[in-house]
Amino acid sequence: EITGIAPVFADEGTVANTAGPSLTFYEASILNRAALEAIFAAHAVDVIIHFAGFKAVGESVAKPLEYYWNNITGTLVLADVAREHGCKNIVFSSSATVYGEPEFIPITESCPKHDATNPYGWTKSMLEQILSDLYTGDNEWNIVLLRYFNPIGAHESGRIGEDPKGIPNNLLPYVAQVAVGKLESVGVFGDDYPTPDGTGVRDY
């Protein structure tokens, strides 16, 4: 049981309607230094759980500059503001994409990182390095890097969960939209890729 904690969270409006009365909500971008300064000034922030960032692999290939700017610059702004306010605890949402083309499967924590295969993956890999360097330079920081694959599921209210506008970038929401009739079918393209089933589309 966790007691005596007053959670504060900031996002761009996705979950505001689901937050209970015990949460203080701010709609803000991590690129907005003034907004972050105001949040840290108003609250004694002890720990940051950092899930903010763009995350669509395919989109990152089409919009690399936007991904590097948002994910890397935003995290630098967040870390700098946190440091100024004495908050040196961060849990960072990284990604299994940092493994690139893994040497073995299933991937374990002993699997070495490889070159990422897309800009999204590179932002996560670079941020892991930046945060590791931050700790090396100042070991008062406590930094946790979470490398996971696509989490799935939704809040029971249906207000929080992956329900993308337009065509989904990940497989499960695509299948879910077919199941509820939003999309007609799941397309399978190609049959000669070097994958077990011959298809080239993977759930990033």
Provide a role label for each language-model segment.
Residues 33, 54-57, 98-99, 151-154:
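Active-site loop signature of alpha/beta-hydrolase-fold enzymes
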Residues 60, 112-113, 149-204:
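A conserved pocket-lining segment of Rossmann-fold NAD(P)-dependent short-chain dehydrogenase/reductase
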